Amino acid sequence: MDIIKTTGQMQQWSERVRKQGKTICLVPTMGYFHDGHLSLMDAGRTQADHLVVSLFVNPIQFGANEDLDAYPTDHDRDFKLAELKGAAVVFAPGPEELYPPGFQTAVTLSQLPLHLCGLSRPVHFQGVATVVTKLFNIVGPDVAVFGSKDFQQLQVIRRLVKDLNFNIRIMGCPIVREADGLAMSSRNLYLSADERNSALSLSCSLALAAEMVQAGETRCRPIIAAVEKFILGHQGTQVDYVCLCDPLTLEAVDTITSPVLLALAVQVGTTRLIDNQVIDPEQ
């Protein structure tokens, strides 16, 4: 496995691979791998001849007072895990490599970031869209794999690829959970034992909402109220949002007549966690 840290070397590697008639799958990450990341690599390895994993904690997707400086890193461990998963390359540039002095370009979307996480993290999706565009241009993948825990990010990237005519297939993979249901996240490391117990309220509240819909409730307001009440009944929780929305546009709905996305963002102690589930009233 190669570890590449400059854009020029990454582009040269990709050009050489394409000249050989081989395909590339990219798994973009911010590192500190858990089983969710590893499942993306497993999926990506089946989609192309070569797997490239990018490892970059993207500073421009963090707002003021967010956890950029505290975000966990262990590159040596990540390199070993990526190699075990069959990665041909880990692309691990530093911030100055992707954002050199004078950098002034940003990629923005006009509608999708106006919902869910975008309301409380106004710079986040501009940062995501910008770095993903750069990674696509540098690596030149045929396929890119993303997890669906950040469902909004997945939809932003799908729209980005469509709108900017990238010839890249986007593959979304299911959320990977701990045995007790907690969605895997690098930020789970921040949680104390008590906070981790409270964090289980997210996945349990998704199940509660699904049960209400299966029992015939189609009005969104009582479902949202029940979910918020359940989460806030756990110590140290603050709800950022609970939203039932259209899975494509992310616009909130009032009544459930077709599959909807239930998306949550909750502060547990000092840690912000997200989770989601698509709920189908016909099932």
UniProtKB/Swiss-Prot annotation:
Where found? Cytoplasm
Give residues annotated as binding beta-alanine: Q61
Q: Where does ATP bind?
A: 30-37, 147-150, 176, 184-187
Q: Which UniProt keywords apply?
A: ATP-binding, Cytoplasm, Ligase, Nucleotide-binding, Pantothenate biosynthesis
Provide the GO MF annotations for this entry: ATP binding; pantoate-beta-alanine ligase activity
Family note: Belongs to the pantothenate synthetase family.
Q: In which residues is (R)-pantoate bound?
A: Q61, Q153
Question: Does the keyword Cytoplasm belong to this entry?
Answer: yes
* PANTHER family linked: CYTIDYLATE KINASE/PANTOATE-BETA-ALANINE LIGASE (PTHR21299), PANTOATE--BETA-ALANINE LIGASE (PTHR21299:SF1)
> What is this enzyme's catalytic activity, as reactions?
(R)-pantoate + beta-alanine + ATP = (R)-pantothenate + AMP + diphosphate + H(+)
**One annotated Gene Ontology cellular component of this protein:** cytosol
Q: Which pathway is this protein engaged in?
A: Cofactor biosynthesis; (R)-pantothenate biosynthesis; (R)-pantothenate from (R)-pantoate and beta-alanine: step 1/1
Pfam families linked to this entry: Pantoate_ligase
Q: Broadest EC class? A: ligase
The EC designation for this entry is 6.3.2.1
Q: What is this protein called?
A: Pantothenate synthetase
Q: Where is the active site?
A: H37
UniProt gene name: panC
Q: A GO biological process this protein is involved in?
A: pantothenate biosynthetic process
Is ATP-binding included in the keywords of this UniProt record? yes
